């Protein structure tokens, strides 16, 4: 079951009021119970704030979570999963952390945290890091950060964390993802060609952190453009002819 804290966004995005969302919950949980469901899932929309109503505090979040948990308890089912749907990108790492800690303290049976946080203000990869540190296991991302929300007032600027950036972060933290980062970067380049404009990822432009044989040559010339920066994948030909920063090339060997 799902409820938006922001009634204004519920009306704009779902064409339903918050009250209508709540009123539909009883039928949903009853149908799940009749079908033999053994565990329930809840989704909290606009958890951290709204472009139309301002910020929402922790108590407001917990009140709405309690309402949904109780709906499941009314039919004898515990909740083991919660999803945060932050289409307007109000998340920040400290609010994610305080919310997850409060939920774990109050409802320890909720074990799975799903994060659908838009990257409107550029803080979402930090929010995802905070969630990773607390054991969240489900994260929504997109190639190059593509996405947006026409109902929140930010359009395409309300995109997502770029998949390639998040996978790079996970790999740096020693978390196996099953993704080939090099292929993700190539896919992000293809996506840019398809949509016809640059996307919002960083690792697809600067490359992963170079190690071992991939470290840059010390006599590399100036690298200015994004095209030239793609040498990590396309080789040194992309920056041939650029100026050298070394006035005395013997300094390279000193």
Located regions from the model:
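Catalytic cores and adjacent flexible loops of soluble metabolic enzymes
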Residues: 1-254
